[in-house]
Amino acid sequence: MNDQTLDPAIHIQQLGTAARDAARGLVSASTEAKNKALMEAARALREATPALLEANARDVASVEGKKDEAFIDRLKLDEARVEGMASALEQIAELPDPVGRVLAQFDRPNGLRIERVAVPIGVIGMIYESRPNVGADASALCLKSGNAVILRGGSESRHSTREIVACMQAGLKAAGLPENAVQTVQTTDRNAVAELLKADEHVDLVIPRGGRGLVELVRDQASVPTLLHLDGNCHSYVHEAADVAKAVDVVRNAKLRRTGICGATESVVVDRVIAPALILALADAMAGDCELRGDETAVQLDDRITPASEDDWNTEYLGPIASVKVVDGLDEAIEWVEGHSSHHTDAILTEDAEAARRFMTAIDSAIVMHNASTQFADGGEFGMGAEIGIATGKMHARGPVGLEQLTSFKYLVHGSGQTRE
């Protein structure tokens, strides 16, 4: 298809109409049929590996010399990554079906029995950047939760995305489910994104997954409801009652296990009482692996720490850099974290249970941890299976967005002829 000949408004309307029809077909789909579709899609991915890698090579070639190595690495597929996508589909097939769960039930004095039951949201628009596997994961999660999905991946990954969608549609067809339950926007025209964001008639929810620029664009332009994931400016606060060795071990992992994920700690907040010992041990542990940028106190305590700028306190580095802030006690730490966190994930390191309770109550983030690495901010680590992202807002879903969060609910009211006076 020549995507440059497509009118974005008409194209999105056509995709939306087809997706809405498919969503109606998925509402009554059995768990067995959805699982079969996922297993068949996994098989199709494995069989299509040569074609998928060829398509991906075209995508990579189109950005070489224009994008940095980190971007190209996120875009690039190899046999191991394709196998990882296929395995992820099989794992999602093994998860419990979230649709049809009875969330609550109660009997009224007039004899009515009322049930609150989980149902699919309907049609989901997924807008993401360069990683092709996001399209596979999102498609699988939407399918298992009974939702149709319209994918709009980055233009750099368009050839890879089309191959992945073809495999998903093959799985749907094999299971007797609507093939249009998984579709991709076929044009690279950016106006298509704007059209998707205002397609209220056809799309029930839009989920962006990518950098701050993408998320802010969706937030500012969407009339469709959204699940937003802003950047992960995550904090690890070392309280005065922390075990220094334990705290340093946790903070090092929180920063360096994978620096490019949204759950990586970007800022270390340290109580003044414990700062001399903690900062020396932290600088030793990070030496050669991570640049530390600190406030005046931190710099005075260890000359391996360079002065931080005001921007450092609000920066998601996504690399081997961390800021270090020294505070006077728990109250100042709470005030500092609340003032600079992106409200994704924040942690306290302490052996004082009351201090931990106060911090975890006061910090208004989607995930708050005690004596654990912020890198555990992940749906898989929460036992939820795969995730479609981390929601940092407060409406509908918050934290890891897995199968359960991709459902809504409705009330089923059973009577025996009751009439209301």
From Swiss-Prot:
Gene3D superfamilies xref list: Aldehyde Dehydrogenase, Chain A, domain 1 (3.40.605.10), Aldehyde Dehydrogenase, Chain A, domain 2 (3.40.309.10)
Superkingdom, taxonomy of origin: Bacteria
E.C. designation(s): 1.2.1.41
Main location: cytoplasm
Transmembrane helix listed as a keyword: no
Catalytically driven reaction(s): L-glutamate 5-semialdehyde + phosphate + NADP(+) = L-glutamyl 5-phosphate + NADPH + H(+)
One MF term in the entry's GO annotations: glutamate-5-semialdehyde dehydrogenase activity
Uppermost EC category: oxidoreductase
Keywords associated with the record: Amino-acid biosynthesis, Cytoplasm, NADP, Oxidoreductase, Proline biosynthesis
GO biological processes: L-proline biosynthetic process
Subcellular compartments: Cytoplasm
Pathway: Amino-acid biosynthesis; L-proline biosynthesis; L-glutamate 5-semialdehyde from L-glutamate: step 2/2
GO CC, alphabetical: cytoplasm
Pfam families in UniProt: Aldedh
Family, similarity comment: Belongs to the gamma-glutamyl phosphate reductase family.
Its job: Catalyzes the NADPH-dependent reduction of L-glutamate 5-phosphate into L-glutamate 5-semialdehyde and phosphate. The product spontaneously undergoes cyclization to form 1-pyrroline-5-carboxylate.
HAMAP family per UniProt: ProA
NCBIfam families in UniProt: PRK00197.1, proA
PANTHER family with a match to the protein in the record: DELTA-1-PYRROLINE-5-CARBOXYLATE SYNTHASE (PTHR11063:SF8), GLUTAMATE SEMIALDEHYDE DEHYDROGENASE (PTHR11063)
Protein name: Gamma-glutamyl phosphate reductase
Organism: Erythrobacter litoralis (strain HTCC2594)
Lineage: Bacteria, Pseudomonadati, Pseudomonadota, Alphaproteobacteria, Sphingomonadales
